[in-house]
Amino acid sequence: MLKDNQKHNESVAPNSAFLSELQRALPEFFTADRYNEQGELIAKGGFDLARFERALKARNIDELTSGYQIDFIGKDYAKKQAGEKSVTVIVPDVEHNTLAENKNSHNLFLTGDNLDVLRHLQNNYADTVDMIYIDPPYNTGSDGFVYPDHFEYSDRALQDMFGLNDTELARLKSIQGKSTHSAWLSFMYPRLFLARKLLKDTGFIFISIDDNEYANLKLMMDEIFGEGGFVTNVMWKRKKEISNDSDNVSIQGEYILVYAKTGQGALRLEPLSKEYIQKSYKEPTEQFPEGKWRPVPLTVSKGLSGGGYTYKITTPNGTVHERLWAYPEASYQKLVADNLVYFGKDNGGIPQRVMYAHHSKGQPTTNYWDNVASNKEGKKEILDLFGDNVFDTPKPTALLKKIIKLAIDKDGVVLDFFAGSGTTAHAVMALNEEDGGQRTFILCTIDQALSNNTIAKKAGYNTIDEISRERITRVAAKIRANNPATNSDLGFKHYRFATPTQQTLDDLDSFDIATGHFINTSGQLAAFTESGFTDMINPFSARGLGVPGGASGEETLLTTWLVADGYKMDIDVQTVDFSGYCARYVDNTRLYLIDERWGTEQTRDLLNHIGTHQLPVQTIVIYGYSFDLESIRELEIGLKQLDQKVNLVKRY
């Protein structure tokens, strides 16, 4: 599969990801692929622009002849990245995931480059995430951000891909290792493009940012999410005190940009604030003792659509009012019976409905948050958990709680692919404990090494992701200590996204699918000369990839394949024995054969299981490196003789 992904990436153009999105939304305007008699692809289908223009004209839809878009050095390369597939593998942290508190958890912590992680998640989490929150690098010049891509293609390949001359190539490569605006935009573009595809149609994304890149981010988000996707720009007061951090203005706030994937979602109402209740509601009275209340007009204007109801109302003091009322007469009488009508101080005024504060559905949020929490609270939370300031700029959980409650219900999925100190996970777990919710989180951060002079390094942490995971563990322990009977999901599954060694990639490249042999550069049969392993499974073990966690090569390959095939990380995997060979079975339909030692006896046993309906199977996926050609042919012939269709997929 890695070879397939590498080959796919070579053909990806800057517009490939866009065309894929367009085809999903408007398949009727794409021509079909064309194949020859041997079933080989000879011409790939494409977008039929003429047909699309005819459809627009037929529906009297005017084209926009002008518009504005953001442009920057590296944009075409960033677009190409958005369409590429990952060439990393997913390594389960078996030692962690099998612990009692984690084995049944639906929370995920993903360690790796978030671009690779987002590419993988396209397969199994597209259109399923309820909200995304990210706190990316602000590109302040002192936050450590530099463009990380090393341009895996040669100069000639880059020139051919994007039609660059020597000067343009030099400009593109100038962003490498830099912190320019173009470098930051090139870094963020593919990540935000892929993130949008993960959201449900009702989903929202919240992005923390400051003045350094706000203007550029707004334009880029307008391009990726559409101008109509813009919801608001929140100003969050992150610092309460005035400081001398500038000669001109003391910076106290930063922004939270909010976008919706489509117009189908709506932010939740917030509970009425104490200040609003104090200002707008009356104190309880003998007549209305249930709590603070306010009178609301029962009349409607004649101009309102939907009309109203005309009838006479006689007040307690005998005054008669005839108006256009908002409620039918029977509904009004019900309000009177429930003591929810106010007739004024003299009991003769125009009747008004009594609304109690505790009956209110809430109020919309504002775009200025000056009383949520500050960065000081975020730092104090870290200090309380760790006993030291192991993270410099953590967001406070109160801020994330507010965002989460605005965006999703109690059972939503929250994604944060710049996880940092793990505040998002902390907020999710705390909210679930407070209101009995079943929200789940997906966190991702890179295993960036910590500098030797940092407090975290001196405290024993080696990488940023270790701090994030330790915070989740400590928060969970604190919740359990406060409530031993809690039913909240306080664990998480951990996976690392790793790149195979160059030696392993060289071995993969040397395999000749047609003959089933490894061929050296001289065209001669070769053993595994590069990776040092005697098979093509163990190089993908945790040991072979140089990461902890104890995963076998089979577990890594299976996890990677399951994600590629659209299965969630928590899919139940069963083991089926075929004459001593352990196969993996999922979804009551799909069988994975990864290990070596498959032969005639196993094929016979498998065909018997399927043919006698002991095991329903629709698809069998085999690891081509573990099978000789004769075993594959024998399996293909046997499957064709069954009275049901079973697909055989060979992966390399």
UniProtKB/Swiss-Prot annotation:
Q: How is this protein named in the record? A: Type III restriction-modification enzyme StyLTI Mod subunit
Q: Which GO terms describe its biological process?
A: DNA restriction-modification system; methylation
What broad taxonomic lineage does this protein's source fall under?
Bacteria, Pseudomonadati, Pseudomonadota, Gammaproteobacteria, Enterobacterales
Protein family (similarity comment) = Belongs to the N(4)/N(6)-methyltransferase family.
Q: Give the protein's function.
A: DNA restriction requires both the Res and Mod subunits.
What changing A126S does, per the record, is: In strain: LT7
Residue ranges of the region described as Binding of S-adenosyl methionine: 135-138
Q: Which reaction does it catalyse?
A: a 2'-deoxyadenosine in DNA + S-adenosyl-L-methionine = an N(6)-methyl-2'-deoxyadenosine in DNA + S-adenosyl-L-homocysteine + H(+)
Q: What is its EC number?
A: 2.1.1.72
This protein's encoding gene: mod
Q: Name one GO cellular component term.
A: cytoplasm
Question: Which InterPro entries does the protein's record reference?
Answer: DNA_methylase_N4/N6, DNA_methylase_N6_adenine_CS, N4/N6-MTase_EcoPI_Mod-like, SAM-dependent_MTases_sf, T3RM_EcoP15I_C
**Swiss-Prot/TrEMBL keywords:** DNA-binding, Methyltransferase, Restriction system, S-adenosyl-L-methionine, Transferase
Q: Which GO terms describe its molecular function?
A: DNA binding; methyltransferase activity; N-methyltransferase activity; site-specific DNA-methyltransferase (adenine-specific) activity
Query: What's the superkingdom here?
Result: Bacteria
Subunit architecture: Homodimer, also forms a functional restriction-competent complex with Res.
